[in-house]
Amino acid sequence: ARQHVGNEPFAVLLGDDLIDPRDPLLTEMLALAEHTGESVIALMPVPPEMIDRYGCAEVVPLEAGLSVAGTGLASGEATNQVRIKSLVEKPAPEDAPSNLAIIGRYVLQPAVFEVLERTQAGAGGEIQLTDALATLATMPTEQGGGVTGVVFQGRRYDTGNQLDYLKAVVQIAAERSDLGPAFRDWL
């Protein structure tokens, strides 16, 4: 991917995380990345017993008074924008720094490629993006580091989970203006 994005920030959207396209999550993430010059990850609260399925974030509110262009939000003032202090991949519930799971939306700065090259295999014996992001979170913004997050409260389906996949198909089909009425009648 490095040769395609060059020295520009880029978005990564994992295919098994389905988020309502009408939701402004990615728009907010792009605006935050442009404003801060840092990578941005999407986070979502999950029950403690599910945190071991996800990367997990330790966060603090963004600095009060930081206006985030294009979002109409000022961080630190009852917003959903946070600074990432640390990240851990698939922690045991008792070791998790929070209940904020990393979900499949990222806006990454190009420095992530160099960090990934230096990242050792982690959870599952694989090089984990979460581990590279944890390193970026400790680096100065001037070096491509720093990571912020947007806490998502909208509708999301993990289509790698069979039940969530079925829920997504039914819900989205039922809401379509062209197919919804006939589909709902059939149901």
Q: Can you say where each PLM-predicted feature lies in the sequence?
A:
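Conserved beta-loop-beta/alpha segment of the NTase-like Rossmann-fold superfamily
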Residues: 1-60, 65, 108-110, 116-119
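Low-complexity, intrinsically disordered Ser/Thr/Pro- and acidic-rich segments
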Residues: 69-73, 77
